Amino acid sequence: MVKAIDIKKEQVAEITDKLQRSASAIVVDYRGLKVEEVTELRKQCREKGLEYKVYKNTLTRLAAENAGMKELVGELVGPNAIVFSYDDPVAAAKVASEFAKTHKNLELKAGLVEGVLYKDAQLEEFASIPSREVLIAKLLGSFKAPISNFAYLIKAIADKKEAEGQA
């Protein structure tokens, strides 16, 4: 027979593992959301490769301490859910923030991104950062522009010399 304490130990180990593996973990207060709204948020998270989980605060506090993320412990008050992102550190904050704009009952409480705790305005600002793919595309675009301009310049010089040679 499995004891309740063993189940709780497994849950703490699971949460600890998720906190350690995640690029970001965003704590949200879902109080006041209807079941359909929570289901929609879960769906949006799944579509982006995120994980939306509700755990008991006591177990989450123990897991945060085990994972060396003590700064998160103070934020675990009231009904909380955690949105985990394992690849893109911005994705969880972005999905939660976008959902909160249309659903006023969802509150972003705190976010742990690569070991740094963000709150309130900092978290909103962090959520506004473009995704990794967009940033890479912008960087590559900025590299491409000077090279393209240089190629056009060389072509113009070659065309001019060719025109002078024919005249």
Swiss-Prot record:
It holds the Pfam family Ribosomal_L10. Keywords: Ribonucleoprotein, Ribosomal protein, RNA-binding, rRNA-binding. GO terms for biological process: translation. One of its GO terms (cellular component) is ribosome. One of its GO terms (molecular function) is large ribosomal subunit rRNA binding. It comes from the Bacteria. Forms part of the ribosomal stalk, playing a central role in the interaction of the ribosome with GTP-bound translation factors. Part of the ribosomal stalk of the 50S ribosomal subunit. The N-terminus interacts with L11 and the large rRNA to form the base of the stalk. The C-terminus forms an elongated spine to which L12 dimers bind in a sequential fashion forming a multimeric L10(L12)X complex. Belongs to the universal ribosomal protein uL10 family. This is Large ribosomal subunit protein uL10.
